Amino acid sequence: ARTGGGGVMTAVASTRLAAPAAEWSAEVHRDEQALAGLADELRDLYDRSPAATPFQTYEWLRAWWGWYGTPGRLRLATVRCRGRLVAAAPLMAGVRHGFPVLVPLAAGQSDFADFLLDPVHTDGAVRHLTRALLDERGWCAVDLCEVRPGSAAHLVAAQWPRRAWRTPSSVCLELPAAGIDDVLDRLPRRTAGKMRAKLRKIDVRGITVESVPPERASDAVHVLLELHLRQWQGRPVNPEHRRERFRRHLAEAAAGMVRDGRAAVLQYRWDERLVASDLVLIGHRYVGAYLYGAIPDLRDCVDVSLMMLRQDLALARDRNRQGVSLLRGDEPYKLKWRPTPVRNERVILGRTAPAAAFAALARTRARLSDRRHHGRPGGHG
């Protein structure tokens, strides 16, 4: 694909598997019942898609569609080889900046966007997925706002026969799945000493942590959100976190994801009183700290972020994951751990001539947003 923005399109490794054209099939599902009908196959495909993140799990997408989806807008592209599902693009029709586009399901609540792709069938699956999308009428561009390095979406972009654009997007911060002492060793000696003293303070207080079982996960998320809102009382908070649809989506998704080992809801108790809770998403390679809440006065007693980071690191090691992702944002409370920054990209795949104007507008708005947030020119060159 021709790419805007310069640079080489990064992608996960491609493996060629020859299969007669007659053994391939592709379609775009518009019937919202199709999402539920493909549940088992989408779960299986996720397991075979090493680049996918928890935001591409069936449970996350189905719960989101149930509370946010608009009837008639689903565009779920699927590819089969010899009858087996080997690729899927969970998209929906929408309008951005006045342009008709296809966007990922749950984009507003997800830190990463991607397609599902079985690497055994990469070349053929990408080719047929591309053709199925281009044959679908009524849109000028696919707009993927948060694409991780090495994502399947980069493979699709690399083979896209029409114009494709990239622009820098959010920064995500990552730590290796080491013990908390190893993380503290990354800090200046005096700072590390203070953090170790804070850990001893947590332990002396006897704060315990429990991973909630699947049958309690939904209720636990409702409690977590109450703690989250109490924690932010009197300060600006994401308005979506106050809405019933967000609460319902998160609770429903968590129940299925905890059951399948794709998430954990951690509850912290002090003298048997619930004082904090943490929703951690568990991907193929990383665990991601998605949302937490704590009673307001807990910060006066212990370092809450340190307490949760220690447990998230332990969870990553227990699940044999490479590390902990602090997900989007480079806030100071994350940067103090000296994590590795990983830059997402916005990938735009053009279909018709207006895509160029859409991409130019999107890139301009991204630069202006970057200046507002960081007081410097945008990172895009």
What do the PLM-derived regions correspond to, one by one?
Residues V79-R80, L105, S110, D118, ...:
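Aromatic (often tryptophan-rich) hydrophobic motifs at membrane interfaces
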Residues T10-E32, P149, A153-D182, R319-G381:
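Active-site/acyl-donor-binding loops of N-acyltransferases
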Residues L134-S151:
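ATP-hydrolysis module of ASCE/P-loop NTPase motor domains
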Residues F115:
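Active-site phosphate/ATP/adenylate-binding loop shared across adenylate-forming ligases
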